[in-house]
Amino acid sequence: MSNENRTCSFCGKSKSHVKHLIEGENAFICDECVSNCIEILHEDGNDGTPSESAGGEPEESGKLPTPAEIVANLNDHVIGQEQAKKALAVSVYNHYKRLRHPKARANVELSKSNILLIGPTGSGKTLLAQSLARKLDVPFVMADATTLTEAGYVGEDVEQIITKLLGKCDFDVEKAQRGIVYIDEIDKISRKSDNPSITRDVSGEGVQQALLKLIEGTVASVPPQGGRKHPNQEFINVDTTNILFICGGAFAGLEKVIRQRTEKGGIGFGASVHSKDENADITKLFGIVEPEDLIKFGLIPELIGRLPVIATLEELDEDALINILTEPKNALVKQYQALFGMENVELEFEEGALRSIARQAMERKTGARGLRSIVERCLLDTMYRLPDLQGLKKVVVGKAVIEEGREPELVFES
């Protein structure tokens, strides 16, 4: 073949249209295609000379935040729950430290520190997991255990969790394999009884078994983008061994199981006297939970064994809810003040109003999750009229607005 007729085997450009044409044994490549290849390798985080460890895994770069730094970051987003924050921070730090030092794992087998969060609705379980993933800059996905089914049943099978995780990082398998999965409502798939003679919730136990494989580490085959619409596409294999799983649930009724184990006396003069403060009582009981209590509640022993770190969250009291309304970076009061500020209007919540909002959330048993709906309801009419209220300078929300449904006080320019 003459020099003039030679073309790049990749883009088809002739020698006269490129600066350089590199000749191989049976092919040619131009300088432009070489540059494109280098760019692709850099985008994948690989410069062509990967530093592989003894375990065949690439070393990760960047500073891993210490447990104290992780807790400090969580404090910006989540109020209270100090013990849960510490437990999470240490577990997450050890998990990612383990991934960054694969050579150490060649001599000692380090187990994964998956986490079980136990706490009432609205106590901050989901927010803790989300904030952790954001701080560590890793892919994060949340799944609802109640929507999961065994393979062969209508609904989501557990491997769809991994499909969602892949989607969060543009189907980058390496990133997904170091992500965090939060499974909410794990208590809702417990079997109905620990007695084998009583009919069990087979579907719930089946989901637990399926989750067990995923959590302990397996190679999940998931469909690529498009899934069933492109049946001829090859499946993507994702190793879940290094994915950190955090499971959470309210575990309503678990306190009765713990109480049965801990109480010595049953009736008469030897019977235990319970605290009038039921919430404080439950928080104390959750603090002494043992794996055997969770088995009796309905989780299978194998699953509990794969969730070695158990962190309990406290019921939020009135003061904690007020702090949630006002203190975090994304506090509700700050959010609404920013929205009103866009209309050049100042928004003020009086102390009595904040206490009433917190009290209503406690009465509804919704914790921090119920705060937004209460605030939204009391400000709805004002926000509807806000763009049309000429000369409005300030809106004041008092106690009567929350408790009696009155309109907030409107202060106009004089």
Curated annotation (Swiss-Prot):
Regions annotated as coiled coil: none
Function: ATP-dependent specificity component of the Clp protease. It directs the protease to specific substrates. Can perform chaperone functions in the absence of ClpP.
A Pfam family of this chain: AAA_2
Positions with a binding annotation for ATP: 120-127
InterPro entries xrefs: AAA+_ATPase (IPR003593), ATP-dep_Clp_protease_ClpX (IPR050052), ATPase_AAA_core (IPR003959), Clp_ATPase_C (IPR019489), Clp_protease_ATP-bd_su_ClpX (IPR004487), ClpX_bact (IPR046425), P-loop_NTPase (IPR027417), Znf_CppX_C4 (IPR010603)
Keywords, comma-separated and alphabetical: ATP-binding, Chaperone, Metal-binding, Nucleotide-binding, Zinc
Domain of life: Bacteria
Gene Ontology MF term list: ATP binding; ATP hydrolysis activity; ATP-dependent protein folding chaperone; protein dimerization activity; unfolded protein binding; zinc ion binding
Protein name in the entry: ATP-dependent Clp protease ATP-binding subunit ClpX
ClpX-type ZB domain location: 1-49
Region described as Disordered: spans on this chain: 44-65
One of the record's GO cellular component terms: HslUV protease complex
GO biological process: cell division; proteolysis involved in protein catabolic process
Binding site residues for Zn(2+): 8, 11, 30, 33
Keyword NAD included in the entry's annotation: no
Claim: ATP-binding is one of the keywords in the record: yes
Oligomer status and interactors: Component of the ClpX-ClpP complex. Forms a hexameric ring that, in the presence of ATP, binds to fourteen ClpP subunits assembled into a disk-like structure with a central cavity, resembling the structure of eukaryotic proteasomes.
Family to which the UniProt record says this protein belongs: Belongs to the ClpX chaperone family.
